[in-house]
Design a protein with these regions (language model features):
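Bacterial Sec-dependent N-terminal signal peptides
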Residues: 1-26
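Short coil-to-beta strand junction motifs in C2/discoidin
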Residues: 68-71
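Beta-sheet ligand-binding and adhesion/scaffold domains
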Residues: 23-45, 52-59, 63, 73-170
Length: 170
């Protein structure tokens, strides 16, 4: 009976632990594209305001051996199973060689792994397919970092004079 009560209590508390995980902050790591077999830098900044998660992503792409970037606003949520769901909301800036298709959006489904010395988000990404483009898939692995000066995304906000976008966390 005692084991049953402990097991029941543990099952009731697990969802509370999942939803109490702190995901705000700056995350830096890599994005692996299954199609191109390229691993490139990837950054996320997540903030929470008025009970809602939002943020920004900074991703890089190689086209013809040249590196291009895109900075996007993202919507962030935590699914019932504890997965971190990140969806593109709007493309803010890029240096793409062609005008990007407005209908392509990326979806990340990440697991939050908490270790003694680091927090990691790891999982899959997929883009939707359109008439012109097929879907892309891949893998994202990012670690929470505290050194904002090491971040290309933070340097972008500083250059734009938009540090108030990230002041919630600093």
């Amino acid at each position: 009976m005692k084991k049953f009560l402990l097991s029941s209590l543990a099952l009731l508390l697990i969802p509370l632990l999942i939803f109490s995980q702190e995901i705000t902050g700056l995350w830096k790591g890599t994005m692996y594209n299954d199609s191109t077999k390229n691993t490139l830098p990837y950054e996320l900044f997540i903030k929470k305001e008025n009970g809602k998660y939002t943020g920004f992503s900074h991703s890089w792409f190689l086209i013809g051996g040249k590196e291009y970037y895109g900075i996007k606003e993202v919507k962030v949520s935590i699914a019932k199973d504890g997965k971190i769901v990140i969806k593109d909301a709007a493309l803010m800036e890029n240096n793409y060689p062609v005008l990007p298709d407005k209908n392509i959006h990326q979806l990340n489904i990440l697991d939050l792994l908490i270790r003694e010395d680091e927090n990691i988000m790891d999982g899959l990404f997929i883009t939707n397919c359109t008439k012109q483009f097929r879907e892309l898939t891949g893998h994202i692995n990012v670690k929470r970092i505290n050194t904002f000066s090491e971040s290309s995304l933070m340097q972008y906000f500083k250059k734009k004079g938009a540090e108030n976008e990230v002041a919630v966390i600093k």
